[in-house]
């Protein structure tokens, strides 16, 4: 994201699809930016333009012929579920609809990567669920890589395959989502994953005579604890639970 804005790290390199962005000149970097779309917490739509014209805007800058840009913008608005709001202005749209316009605009130049910077932080839970469902669908349908930047762990659980936890500008922990949520190894990872009031030792296996159960793949609907008590002829106590 920093490289897209022409901010480069003080150390290290940034690569995209086999190309080192940190080694590119201005002209080549501008070309690579076309392969990166971005959506934000605030939608940054042009208030004097319709939804259709907002989606056309990046194509206008790239020199795409007007008729071709308009046709693609219509296709993208249909893709994000706003076929009936193309001529609406941002002030006439809900927060979720504005974010869908922003997503369509970010896809206008056919990027390889979509960067989502706190894209659902300003939305209510129901609207957030709809936007996340759309992003998952776009990932599957278009084969586009989606990079999500968020402090909402529920968002990570919902749509991500892998997660990197950053602390003080450094990657503290990285791995598959299920792996990180099941057994975070670092202090910052445990603080992010566990709910307030949860004993951290429960995540490390160091709490005496206690076990942490993780349900996956619909197994939460199975009577696991009840069956265990019947078979072992013993009782268990649930110290804490979360989703």
Where are these regions (language model features)?
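ABC family nucleotide-binding domain
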Residues: 1-139
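ABC ATPase "signature
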Residues: 174-175, 183
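A short, surface-exposed alpha-helical micro-motif characterized by mixed small hydrophobic
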Residues: 156-158
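Conserved H-loop
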Residues: 41, 143-149, 151-152
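C-terminal boundary and immediately downstream tail of ABC-type ATPase nucleotide-binding domains
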Residues: 181-212, 232
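Non-catalytic connector elements of ABC transporters
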Residues: 207-243
């Amino acid at each position: 994201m920093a490289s897209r804005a022409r901010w480069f790290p003080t150390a290290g390199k940034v690569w995209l699809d086999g190309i080192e962005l940190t080694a590119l000149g201005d002209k080549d970097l501008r070309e690579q930016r076309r392969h990166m779309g971005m959506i934000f917490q605030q939608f940054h739509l042009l208030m004097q333009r319709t939804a259709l014209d907002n989606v056309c805007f990046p194509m206008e800058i790239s020199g795409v012929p007007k008729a071709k840009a308009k046709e693609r913008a219509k296709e993208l608005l249909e893709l994000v579920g706003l076929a009936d709001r193309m001529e609406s202005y941002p002030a006439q749209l809900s927060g979720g609809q504005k974010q869908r316009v922003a997503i369509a605009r970010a896809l206008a130049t056919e990027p390889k990567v979509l960067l989502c910077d706190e894209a659902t932080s300003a939305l209510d839970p129901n609207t957030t669920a709809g936007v996340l469902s759309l992003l998952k669908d776009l990932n599957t349908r278009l084969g586009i890589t989606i990079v999500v930047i968020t402090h909402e762990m529920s968002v990570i659980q919902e749509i991500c395959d892998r997660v990197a936890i950053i602390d003080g500008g450094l990657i503290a922990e990285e791995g598959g989502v299920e792996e990180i949520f099941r057994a975070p190894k670092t202090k910052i990872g445990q603080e992010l994953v566990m709910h307030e009031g949860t004993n951290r030792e429960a995540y490390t296996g160091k709490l005496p005579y206690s076990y942490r159960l993780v349900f996956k793949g619909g197994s939460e609907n199975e009577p696991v604890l009840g069956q265990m008590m019947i078979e072992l002829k013993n009782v268990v106590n649930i110290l804490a639970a979360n989703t």
